[in-house]
Amino acid sequence: MLYLTKIRNAESEFTGNEQKIADFLRANVSELKSVSSRKMAKQLGISQSSIVKFAQKLGAQGFTELRMALIGEYSASREKTNATALHLHSSITSDDSLEVIARKLNREKELALEQTCALFDYARLQKIIEVISKAPFIQITGLGGSALVGRDLSFKLMKIGYRVACEADTHVQATVSQALKKGDVQIAISYSGSKKEIVLCAEAARKQGATVIAITSLADSPLRRLAHFTLDTVSGETEWRSSSMSTRTAQNSVTDLLFVGLVQLNDVESLKMIQRSSELTQRLK
């Protein structure tokens, strides 16, 4: 569980006191060994119970667990930084050579994968895979780079026998959404979770009784609130990566895991279909 990442991504939903706690923890993460909830409460002018509730909101049992986890994350981060002569977590600049850019991009994608995988609730993921496996029909929605991730997932699911619709046109996406039925699944892919087209489709799907699964960020959003299930992704995009490269990396890690999980549920038949698909496409060469 990456608590520093959760704190950063959940800022939009913090109350005033929660924001005080978050700011203190991030500013003093290197000194947390000597910080108690009592000392922290006194310094911030809030109650100890507020600090405990904040820790529980992030998924920890209490402040002690959160504090120890943050200390561990900080130490691990320092070790990774010291292991490389280049500060590969830093932003790409116009002065960087192609070699440096390549290393920074690679590190950014590695971080997106590490942080996304650290957030997985595998029991929930297994439940999601089971829900998808029973769906008579699956719709996948997304815009821009997220649409590309969705299209890739749709091809993989069709290859193992699922009925899937993944249309790029937003009007068609909306039309398909309103025709979904109970038992059907809509997989909505949106890092921001606030794109009106995707939210509209999710609303329509829920109204029809379909199950909505959102692949989105940790931040509070309309899509996150609409979804029956969420799969969290983490990405550190900057102005130099406007095409959402690390976001797609994180999203692809989630969709690939869904695909492999679905193959495992019916491995013999799935592998037969994958083999038949490969044989057919070979004949087209």
Curated annotation (Swiss-Prot):
UniProt entry keywords in alphabetical sequence: Carbohydrate metabolism, DNA-binding, Repressor, Transcription, Transcription regulation
Residue ranges constituting the SIS domain according to the UniProt record: 128-268
User: Residue limits of the HTH rpiR-type domain?
Assistant: 1-77
- The transmembrane residues are none
The terms under GO molecular function for this entry are: carbohydrate derivative binding; DNA binding; DNA-binding transcription factor activity
Gene Ontology biological process terms from the UniProt entry: carbohydrate derivative metabolic process; N-acetylmuramic acid catabolic process; negative regulation of DNA-templated transcription; regulation of carbohydrate catabolic process
Pathway the protein takes part in: Amino-sugar metabolism; N-acetylmuramate degradation [regulation]
Q: Which InterPro entries match?
A: Homeodomain-like_sf (IPR009057), HTH_RpiR (IPR000281), RpiR-like (IPR047640), RpiR-like_SIS (IPR035472), SIS_dom (IPR001347), SIS_dom_sf (IPR046348), Tscrpt_reg_HTH_MurR (IPR022821), WH-like_DNA-bd_sf (IPR036388)
- Protein origin, superkingdom: Bacteria
User: Record's PROSITE patterns?
Assistant: HTH_RPIR, SIS
Q: Which NCBIfam families match?
A: PRK15482.1 (NF012026)
The entry's function note states: Represses the expression of the murPQ operon involved in the uptake and degradation of N-acetylmuramic acid (MurNAc). Binds to two adjacent inverted repeats within the operator region. MurNAc 6-phosphate, the substrate of MurQ, is the specific inducer that weakens binding of MurR to the operator.
- Which HAMAP family does the entry link to? HTH_type_MurR
Assembly behavior: Homotetramer.
What name does UniProt use for this protein?
HTH-type transcriptional regulator MurR
**Which organism is this entry from?**
Escherichia coli O9:H4 (strain HS)
